């Protein structure tokens, strides 16, 4: 059961590859909206769990974009030091 709860911390489902690419800011905005909705006391358990999974996917994708940006920055810094 606990493994299922943290399953969303892994890579998003394969069908996400077909989805249009979002920017880091768009992922963060989607995550903020999900958090706002999760605070709704009238949200059902099922809807809350679905929303949680979606939010975790948005977080994962935003983190990946941030990680890639950092790696690109590091690469540029290394190139600048050689020049």
UniProtKB/Swiss-Prot annotation:
GO cellular component terms given for this protein: cytoplasm; exodeoxyribonuclease VII complex
Region feature (Disordered): 1-25
User: Is Nuclease one of the keywords?
Assistant: yes
**Which organism does this sequence originate in?**
Helicobacter pylori (strain P12)
The UniProt entry's GO biological process terms, in alphabetical order, are: DNA catabolic process
What is an example of a GO molecular function annotated in this UniProt entry?
A: exodeoxyribonuclease VII activity
Catalytic activity reported: Exonucleolytic cleavage in either 5'- to 3'- or 3'- to 5'-direction to yield nucleoside 5'-phosphates
Q: Which family does it belong to?
A: Belongs to the XseB family.
Instruction: Supply the gene name.
Output: xseB
Q: How does it assemble?
A: Heterooligomer composed of large and small subunits.
**What EC number(s) is this enzyme filed under?**
3.1.11.6
- Tell me where in or outside the cell this protein is found: Cytoplasm
Q: What class of enzyme is it?
A: hydrolase
Record-linked Pfam families = Exonuc_VII_S
Coarse class of the primary localization is cytoplasm
Q: Which UniProt keywords apply?
A: Cytoplasm, Exonuclease, Hydrolase, Nuclease
* Protein name stated in the entry: Exodeoxyribonuclease 7 small subunit
Which NCBIfam families is this protein grouped with? PRK14065.1, xseB
- What does this gene product do? Bidirectionally degrades single-stranded DNA into large acid-insoluble oligonucleotides, which are then degraded further into small acid-soluble oligonucleotides.
């Amino acid at each position: 059961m606990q493994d299922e709860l943290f399953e969303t911390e892994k890579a998003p489902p394969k069908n996400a590859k077909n989805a249009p690419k979002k920017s880091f800011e768009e992922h963060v905005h989607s995550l903020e909206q999900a958090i706002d909705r999760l605070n709704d006391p009238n949200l059902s358990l099922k809807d809350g769990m679905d929303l949680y999974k979606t939010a975790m996917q948005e977080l994962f994708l935003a983190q990946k974009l941030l990680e890639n940006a950092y790696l690109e920055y590091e690469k540029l810094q290394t190139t600048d030091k050689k020049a």
